[in-house]
From Swiss-Prot:
Belongs to the DEFL family. Keywords: Antimicrobial, Disulfide bond, Fungicide, Plant defense, Secreted, Signal, Vacuole. Stable under extremes of temperature. The lineage of its organism: Eukaryota, Viridiplantae, Streptophyta, Embryophyta, Tracheophyta. Transmembrane segments: none annotated. Residues 1-25 form the signal peptide. The gene is D1. One of its GO terms (cellular component) is extracellular region. InterPro entries: Defensin_plant, Scorpion_toxin-like, Scorpion_toxin-like_sf. This is Flower-specific defensin. It comes from Nicotiana alata (Winged tobacco).
Length: 105
């Protein structure tokens, strides 16, 4: 009886840990509107992104653009039209594919 109770407690604890790691906000990225020129180091990019109300920013590896990041919020996606969402996702996908293609060569 004691062993099954101990096993049950362990199973519940393990399940809680696995679930906690899965519940993570997706990170949304967008190019900075205020950062001028080519992005070389993170601090100026991060400063520009924070001034634009994002949580962080970094330079893209290949295209050297300043990308601002923040946790995705469901409500923001609902306020945009389908065409706007598709256009943003297409730009992000195109940049990711270009970087991947360049890295593979």
């Amino acid at each position: 009886m004691a062993r099954s109770l101990c096993f049950m407690a362990f199973a519940i604890l393990a399940m809680m840990l696995f679930v906690a790691y899965e519940v993570q906000a997706r990170e949304c990225k967008t190019e900075s509107n205020t950062f001028p020129g080519i992005c070389i180091t993170k601090p100026p990019c991060r400063k520009a992104c924070i001034s634009e109300k994002f949580t962080d920013g970094h330079c893209s590896k290949i295209l050297r653009r300043c990308l601002c990041t923040k946790p995705c919020v469901f409500d923001e996606k609902m306020t945009k039209t389908g065409a706007e969402i598709l256009a943003e996702e297409a730009k992000t996908l195109a940049a990711a594919l270009l970087e991947e293609e360049i890295m593979d060569n």
